[in-house]
């Protein structure tokens, strides 16, 4: 069993057991996956600026509890699989601020991503409990790192072939065979972690 499933299954059992037994409502699951923008790099300290525009004042009110601290959803939970290098892991709990970019997967990063206001909005809009499954890594490519198996191996286009097999230059791999072997090894790595 994949490490991510080993972590996620107990969380799902806990959430389903508590919420569904009490409410007998289906669990609404949303998957948020992506790169650096999905990680989220907005610091909690920047919340005040949202109040500068009258159009976003209602959003700021939703983001904060009565004491001015970030809101904590009672009906929405999050499982966030992320990490740096080989140190991938899961952070989970009731949805609140701190599930943005994290250097340590299980520690509050003091940041938010789209999961925060998305989760607050879904919690307010839906009567059922909400689970957000988020997975995100910055600095990764869609054509290699997140490439799904059904897309096949990454193929150089004609321009790349002409450029890469031409004269040496900036950004051109020095050892094409090694570069292609690494590309093959890396293809789909983060897609598999995500799934």
Regions found by a protein language model. Give the residues of each.
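Positively charged n-region of N-terminal signal peptides that target proteins for export
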Residues: 1-7, 122
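Short, low-complexity interaction segments enriched in Ser/Thr/Pro/Gly
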Residues: 3, 21-22
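Cell-envelope and extracellular/periplasmic
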Residues: 22-195
